[in-house]
């Protein structure tokens, strides 16, 4: 396989990942059109790929300067260098995030000369040396101070060929970059990747056509590489997505891109599924559909089962949906109206621990394309009503072990 790769991840000038050193240095600030709904004054965030000046200059020469390659098969050889049992378990859990959602299988092979190498180093630098397969040992450095499952998954995404979402050539339709607040040494991490390709002499790139997803694992959060964390570096055109960016979860479309590249025919002739709503036969089990979050059933036509959600039909009168009690519940609701109508809704109340990338949140999927991550609210909620693009919305509630609550007002709009 030598087809040129994807449009969802890494900067060409190498970078590091670290736990934010200034998580409590800036209070939550006001944003026009949004209302604060946080239960704390200080937002928490981890900084995906905080630039290390030393690492950038040391490794710049190693950036791939030719065609970007896929791996030869869905079996990816890997090695782990250094670290104790806990570190090695962490690496395997990060890898498993890809295996659980895709056909990829990572095979540990200490003898392979063409493999991903996960290397433990002291410090707060985590980075990938190449985008896509380079045809030799490909090091992913995991610093002891930034070793997290999602960091491993994010950096592995780079090795699989992903660019950052916010570096897509169409990104200006979805986000704005506040250049005056971007650290000078991080500039390359915010350039559109076509500019980076030209700078490094890479000419052949064939982007996979997937819509822009604020909830991609490969998207920086709003204050990434900020000179001052009291201001954003990445501003979504739709401000209600401001805390959706920077998630620690894999998005439905992240996995789909990989499955389209490495195993597009895995279930061909093995099933007669008619998957709806952008779902597709699961390459890990061809008897079921892999569905966007919120949908389930044999063909993605039903609501994803949960002990606390359900189907709700909106009327012409305002109704209210309130979150159930409990810190560990996971709830899915579908609010629908007849074809030709829309759902008008607004988060009327709520309280969550604030974090960029929302670890505890209520998510509302109101777009026509239900594959896209909805807007996740944990720090802010829109002050005005929102109207759905179709005759349904999905409400997803994940407190994730934290104290949280929300109320949603909704009604039918003809």
UniProtKB/Swiss-Prot annotation:
Pfam families: Astacin, CUB
Localization in the cell: Secreted
Keyword Signal listed: yes
Cofactor note: Binds 1 zinc ion per subunit.
EC number: 3.4.24.-
One annotated GO molecular function: zinc ion binding
Principal location listed in the UniProt entry: secreted
GO CC, alphabetical: extracellular region
Enzyme superclass (EC): hydrolase
Chain ranges of the CUB domain: 308-414
Binding site for Zn(2+): 154, 158, 164
Cysteines paired by S-S bonds: 103-263, 126-146, 267-286, 289-300, 308-331, 358-378
Active-site residues from the entry: 155
Positions of the pro-segment in this chain: 21-61
Gene3D superfamilies (alphabetical): Collagenase (Catalytic Domain), Spermadhesin, CUB domain
Domain of life: Eukaryota
Transmembrane segments: none
Matches recorded under SUPFAM superfamilies: Metalloproteases ('zincins'), catalytic domain, Spermadhesin, CUB domain
Glycan-carrying positions: 24
SMART domains: CUB, ZnMc
Protein name as catalogued: Zinc metalloproteinase nas-26
Natural source organism: Caenorhabditis elegans
